[in-house]
């Protein structure tokens, strides 16, 4: 019923092809016992949209299902892109279907609450993850237990390259010379010397080697949620999450699936851009409605300006995009599938064929129908499945077996299917020699072939992010910076991209900044106050809340208004160091740290003044004229001292943010 209503909305007129496909899918879903699964997912997504949570386009093999498309679970038409349902669920293969749904980061909690409310706390659990001891943490833990000094433990742990301890200590000298370069080589040499000594440090390394890889702690799977038809304790062992009252399974992801439980992946999609656009431009955007022929977006791909674009941001990919000059969505799907170890070697030929410098050839004219979009190169498993049906009359189940045999390199199965393919093709009047060549090509290509449903979904998410970057560059980059706020290397990398794009990134400012990076009225990006060390979310909230009616004029104005229980001395000091008060024209950064004759920094005196002012206001000790009876304000004057020098100012910025914001120490030495 729901599928038919959805089909009417999605397609308008239902053609015979669509009707047959829907009947086939619904029959398989009913026979494999999964109608409930589809209904739960459909209900979740509808509820999320009602709650104002943005939902991604759906990823993975589920994109091959027309039923999922009609129910609003996925947002790409599988018939238009030749995506196959058998890739997701087929009558001969009864493995659990797995639908990955993206909810935006902030909305995920809301959806989880909805699931618990609907199905009850005793039928919903998150999935446990087991954290293992890695090389460095096993050294640190062992050092702590054996009482090796903290400094020495840290020094040894920092020598470990990105390798297992066991591999390091078994490595022979000539292997070391061959595989390790420069600093890594000398570090490993030192490690081996410590290992072979009989002192406490040597003992620490020997014990750490034994402990490496053992389970250290448990966490919660960021995305997975289990829903059971009855009390969850009847199905799996459970425990309670560390940071909430929610149940968590004691089985991890792989076991849960084998136990045949209903697993739904919640994956947080970054939808901050859309929120920023709404805030700045008062436009409500739905990325699932973006047109797939937008010239501005394709121009961005053609210039290779895809830094910060999902799946298309690596250096190699950007180079290939410039050569390929993609101008249709199919090109993006193919590049996503080809840009991986293995099929990478096909990219130059793919580019030449697209640009007309290499001839497009088909072994049989019938192959053009399915290989045209990839210029005669077999890129997807789906193409092999469709061609085996068309050329040799394979059933849908056989075609999926062939895919499985190729993808997993099951050579016995391939041997079994080959005669079936040659004979079936011969019945359709195709030359056995040509069929043999096609089969040989497929075998060579088999291990590379990619799932087109995956590629299409990834390309669609990549396209949506590129569309936003092309049309709303400042908002998009502000969102990218916010998503990487905790990784300062990434922040400076993306700030460089902003400079290339001609977007100004301004330092933090208590009158303009939010917790995350945002775009101001003049189209520049403002640093997020949350990126400053020691400045917490609640402190930022009270600063934002109290400037709604008017901006803060001075530091005194600020401490009179904000809740000083939430914004403490550390918050104020680090804001000052980062330049958060630079918009107060009457003062400069050094004044806040001026120490008076009693040894008190000025910022501390300002905070005392603020507390006193707020106390007095509370106890409403006002005189007749409504003025503050306590005259503290007049006593505090900005100290007279010289400003920080350029280098000191920058050193302070780097200390509290991790990067230089207002300039760079070497700017003075730039060539004119």
Give, region by region, the residue ranges found by the protein language model.
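Noncatalytic, beta-rich nucleic-acid-contacting surfaces in large DNA/RNA-processing enzymes
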Residues: 1-672
């Amino acid at each position: 019923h729901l599928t038919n209503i959805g089909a009417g909305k999605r397609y308008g007129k239902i053609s015979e092809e669509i009707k047959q496909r829907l009947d086939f899918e619904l029959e398989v879903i009913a026979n494999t016992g999964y109608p409930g699964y589809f209904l739960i997912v459909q209900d979740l997504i509808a509820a999320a949209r009602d709650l104002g949570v943005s939902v991604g386009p759906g990823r993975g093999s589920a994109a091959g299902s027309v039923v999922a498309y009609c129910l609003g679970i996925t947002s790409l038409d599988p018939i238009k892109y030749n995506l196959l349902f058998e890739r997701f669920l087929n009558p001969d293969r009864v493995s659990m279907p797995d639908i990955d749904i993206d909810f935006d980061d902030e909305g995920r909690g809301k959806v989880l609450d909805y699931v618990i409310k609907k199905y009850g706390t005793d039928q919903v659990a998150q999935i446990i993850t087991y954290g293992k001891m890695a090389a460095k943490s096993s050294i640190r833990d062992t050092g702590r237990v054996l009482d090796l000094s903290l400094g020495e433990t840290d020094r040894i742990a920092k020598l470990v390259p990105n390798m297992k301890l066991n591999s390091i200590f078994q490595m022979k000298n000539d292997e070391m010379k061959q595989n390790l370069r420069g600093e890594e080589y000398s570090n490993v040499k030192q490690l081996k010397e410590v290992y072979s000594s009989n002192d406490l440090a040597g003992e620490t390394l020997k014990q750490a080697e034994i402990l490496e890889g053992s389970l250290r702690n448990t966490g919660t799977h960021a995305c997975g949620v289990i829903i059971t038809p009855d009390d969850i304790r009847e199905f799996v062992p459970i425990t309670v999450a560390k940071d909430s009252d929610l149940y968590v399974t004691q089985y991890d992801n792989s076991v849960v699936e084998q136990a045949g439980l209903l697993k739904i992946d919640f994956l947080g999609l970054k939808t901050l851009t859309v929120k920023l656009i709404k805030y700045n431009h008062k436009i409500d955007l739905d990325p699932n409605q973006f047109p797939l022929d937008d010239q501005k977006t394709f121009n961005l791909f053609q210039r290779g300006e895809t830094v910060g674009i999902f799946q298309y941001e690596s250096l190699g990919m950007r180079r290939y995009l410039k050569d390929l000059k993609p101008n249709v969505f199919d090109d993006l799907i193919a590049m996503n599938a080809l840009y991986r170890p293995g099929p990478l070697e096909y990219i130059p030929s793919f580019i030449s064929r697209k640009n007309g410098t290499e001839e497009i050839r088909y072994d049989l004219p019938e192959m053009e129908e399915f290989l045209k979009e990839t210029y005669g190169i077999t890129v997807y498993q789906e193409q092999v499945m469709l061609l085996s049906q068309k050329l040799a009359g394979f059933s849908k189940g056989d075609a999926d077996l062939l895919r499985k045999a190729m993808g997993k390199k099951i050579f016995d199965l391939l041997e079994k299917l080959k005669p079936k393919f040659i004979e079936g093709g011969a019945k359709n009047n195709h030359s056995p020699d040509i069929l043999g060549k096609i089969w040989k090509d497929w075998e060579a290509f088999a291990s590379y072939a990619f799932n087109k449903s995956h590629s299409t979904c990834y390309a669609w998410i990549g396209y949506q992010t590129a569309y936003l970057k092309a049309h709303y560059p400042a908002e998009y980059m502000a969102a990218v910076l916010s998503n990487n706020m905790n990784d300062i290397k990434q922040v400076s990398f993306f700030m460089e991209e902003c400079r290339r794009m001609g977007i100004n990134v301004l330092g933090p400012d208590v009158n303009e900044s939010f917790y995350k990076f945002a775009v101001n009225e003049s189209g520049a990006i403002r640093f997020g106050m949350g990126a400053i060390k020691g400045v917490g979310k609640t402190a930022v909230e009270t600063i934002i809340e109290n400037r709604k009616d008017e901006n803060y004029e001075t530091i005194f104005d600020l401490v009179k208004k904000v809740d000083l229980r939430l914004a403490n001395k550390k918050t104020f000091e680090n804001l000052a160091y980062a330049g958060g008060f630079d918009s107060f024209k009457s003062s400069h950064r050094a004044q806040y740290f001026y120490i008076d004759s009693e040894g008190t920094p000025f910022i501390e005196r300002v905070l005392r003044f603020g507390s006193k002012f707020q106390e007095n206001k509370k106890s409403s000790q006002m005189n007749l004229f409504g003025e503050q009876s306590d005259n503290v304000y007049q006593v505090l004057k900005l100290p007279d001292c010289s400003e920080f020098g350029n280098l000191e100012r920058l050193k302070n910025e780097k200390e509290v943010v991790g990067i230089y914001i207002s300039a760079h120490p070497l700017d003075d030495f730039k060539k004119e």
